[in-house]
Amino acid sequence: MRVLHLASEVFPFSRSGGLGDVLGALPAVQARLGEDAEVTVLSPWYASLQGEPQELWRGEAWGEQAWLGELRQDGVRYLFLGLNEFQRPGLYHPDDVERFCAFGRAALPALDAVGVTPDVLHGHDWQAGLVVAHARLRGLRTAFSVHNLQYQGRWNLHEAAGWTGLPDWTFGPDGVEFFGDLNLMKAGLNFAGHVTTVSPTYAQEITTPQYGEGLEGLLVRLTHEGRLSGILNGLDQDRWNPRTDPDIAAYSDPAGKAGAVKALRQEFGLDDAPILATVSRLADQKGMDLLITALPELVRDWNVVVLGGGDPLLEAALTGWANHPRVAFASGMNEPLAHRIYAGAHAFAMPSRFEPCGLSQLIAMRYGTLPIVRETGGLADTVPPEVGFRFADATAPAFLQACREAQAAFQDPAQWQTRATRAMSLDFSWDGPARQYLELYRGL
């Protein structure tokens, strides 16, 4: 079975978040587990791409100059589609709908040029939605994964219709139209043979008005047709392994964390209070405003360490706290520092308003750091109550109550050790999800 993944980013070649992490792990595990699986990944050839693909082809695709490059790693063939639209710094820009329409038009003709004919095409998030539509119109078997429904790839349809290369009949509510806009997420949902989300709970949540982002009616229909399901993301357990992590003093059990905790205290000048940390985009979705609102009470019992960037108002608020002796804030993203935080913290805060799956809580538990999470999406599916601390309402008081429960547990070393040992023993490898996807493909 020839499987083709399409995504806007893939670790380690291009990455801005969890989507890149998934595409950096899932295809390699599928290639290892699937005896008959040939796995290829197609992604844009960004000017900032980390790596040097070997050029395979250069020509025209849908009337536009295009080129394809190749890298092979871990049994996976990585193809990179070059277009003029992607020859600028960074990954994402305000005109991304137009850019990924160009990608969506050119992808299949470029693959034709090098003889890539997949049995199953698996698109990821709205940037791949147009490719899924074109593939379905060709009669290919297709799957589409929603990693975050909030981002949909919308643009005025009157202006954008000509960017798509789709026939006119697709520009209605049963196709790609959404309140007068082109909606590339909706293209993926409507044209895929099967749609997955990245956790079972999120698959249920997005059929409701609270989480459906205006697409809940379509998602309810897909559920009734048996075309929507949730498959949990896994974790790259080689990349995130406290036993072999080069960025920390390695350890294999909760007692071994002491060196990492001491190092983090020294790095940020923290006192002996337990460390509550988060590594996150600073965004409304992540509930960082709840954490900031809770800081006056949190610092009575906790040191608080935050690594992240995003919303300027949230960054400014955290910067304003940075002189407090129990608060440390590092702006931006820094992977070696992230490793040190996951290892050196005692607890990890994720007060998300919604969380399709979440990887941070999986990493935290892998490192024996106990999550404090809101019961939503993948957080509800992955953090057992006997390991972490959960709360239901997206409010600062509810979050604080969960933090108090964690603080009380921390005062009982035996209980904390038991929870941390359980956390480190949980299996969130990609093997199970990879098998589920392969089984899904066979049923398309």
From Swiss-Prot:
It catalyses: [(1->4)-alpha-D-glucosyl](n) + ADP-alpha-D-glucose = [(1->4)-alpha-D-glucosyl](n+1) + ADP + H(+). It is an enzyme of class 2 (transferase). The keyword Glycosyltransferase applies. GO terms for molecular function: alpha-1,4-glucan glucosyltransferase (ADP-glucose donor) activity; alpha-1,4-glucan glucosyltransferase (UDP-glucose donor) activity. GO terms for biological process: glycogen biosynthetic process. It holds the Pfam family Glyco_trans_1_4. InterPro entries: GS/SS, Starch_synth_cat_dom. Keywords: Glycogen biosynthesis, Glycosyltransferase, Transferase. ADP-alpha-D-glucose binds at R15. Pathway: Glycan biosynthesis; glycogen biosynthesis. Its EC number is 2.4.1.21. The keyword Coiled coil does not apply. Synthesizes alpha-1,4-glucan chains using ADP-glucose. Belongs to the glycosyltransferase 1 family. Bacterial/plant glycogen synthase subfamily. This is Glycogen synthase. It comes from Deinococcus radiodurans (strain ATCC 13939 / DSM 20539 / JCM 16871 / CCUG 27074 / LMG 4051 / NBRC 15346 / NCIMB 9279 / VKM B-1422 / R1). The gene is glgA.
